């Protein structure tokens, strides 16, 4: 006899480290394979099972971040562990090869400027039309100049940095050497 959907879901959730996002669509895919269900049936079964887990308090450490996104928490001396927002940003806007970080944040990270930028800008295929702010994740997303792929992602990021070098307050005496070193480290053949 197979496990109940709720037990299956709890088993899958328990192996996820605290703070890491848990997506119901991924749980549904696992249920579909394990129980040989259609995608639609698996989604419905997952929704019901997760709701039961939350309502009955089967896993008191499970928290809902937003519809379809959950995470496990743990108590620390500083309060509860929250969701890993960096992972959420990567899953939503950057992976798999659909976006990259741009703006002054990248220049700061590679050491071209000492100014810590106020905003974090991502170029992503998810952005349609114009620049907008995701207030929940505290990032600005903008559409790329061309569709981002695995092959052109690094090139586009370097081109954005070259464009920014002309406008940004640069502290480095030889910014183009720093950019060249950065591209070599990234194994880009630029």
Enumerate the predicted regions with their spans.
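Short beta-edge/loop segments at beta->alpha junctions of small alpha/beta modules
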Residues: 1-92
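Hydrophobic alpha-helical interaction segments
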Residues: 140-190
């Amino acid at each position: 006899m197979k496990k109940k959907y709720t037990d299956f879901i709890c088993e899958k959730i328990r192996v996820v480290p605290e703070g890491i996002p848990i997506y119901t669509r991924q749980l549904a895919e696992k249920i579909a394979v394990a129980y040989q269900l259609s995608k639609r049936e698996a989604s419905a079964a997952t929704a019901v099972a997760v709701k039961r887990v939350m309502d009955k308090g089967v896993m008191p450490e499970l928290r809902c971040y937003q519809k379809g996104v959950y995470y496990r928490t743990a108590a620390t001396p500083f309060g509860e562990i929250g969701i890993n927002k960096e992972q959420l940003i990567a899953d939503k806007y950057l992976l798999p090869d659909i976006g990259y970080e741009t703006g002054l944040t990248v220049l700061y990270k590679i050491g071209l400027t000492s100014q810590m930028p106020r905003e974090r800008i991502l170029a992503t295929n998810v952005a349609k039309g114009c620049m907008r702010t995701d207030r929940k994740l505290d990032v600005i997303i903008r559409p790329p100049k061309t569709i981002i792929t695995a092959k052109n992602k690094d090139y586009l990021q370097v081109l954005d940095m070259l464009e920014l070098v002309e406008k940004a307050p640069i502290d480095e005496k030889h910014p183009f050497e720093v950019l060249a070193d950065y591209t070599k480290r990234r194994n880009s053949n630029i």
